[in-house]
Amino acid sequence: MINNTPLSHIKELAEYIALQYKEKLTPVDKIAEDEGLELFYDGYESGTFDGMTVYLNRKFYVHLNVDSGNKQDSTRGRFTLAHELGHYFIDAHRVGLQKGILVPHSSKTNKKQFDTIEREADYFASCLLMPESRFQNEIFRKKFNYDLIQNLATQYNVSITACAFRFAQIGNHP
């Protein structure tokens, strides 16, 4: 069984990693490259999976399914890669993959445990792509409205939905 990682730790980890790079647009491909991860943007049929992190022969491989819209530098592709980076950087996920406790295919995993692990990786992705310290500066004392969210989504190259969720998580107060 994999233990849950506190969200505060996930946020701190993702923000720390993002802020190692000066670019406002978190360079997820560069992060993967700097970690020595091999990325594969390939077609695996639509609906099979978005992304998958595999540990094999003492090395991590990340597969991104372009048939599901996960093209390099697309909003969906960036979020999926950031999510997969969550599986790599969150200790419990990485160790679980290394020890075979976690398997790359959801159908072989305990549903409740899988949901928690996937939510943690989603939260990591959100924090990595929209680090609170940078994002807070953009939304400080601004009212939530569609134009603001659309503008921020474009600036951070994320979906409007991901941006709206992040705005709701962080808020626009001091």
What are these regions (language model features)?
Residues M1-P174:
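Active-site hotspot residues in diverse enzymes, especially metal/ion-binding acidic/histidine motifs
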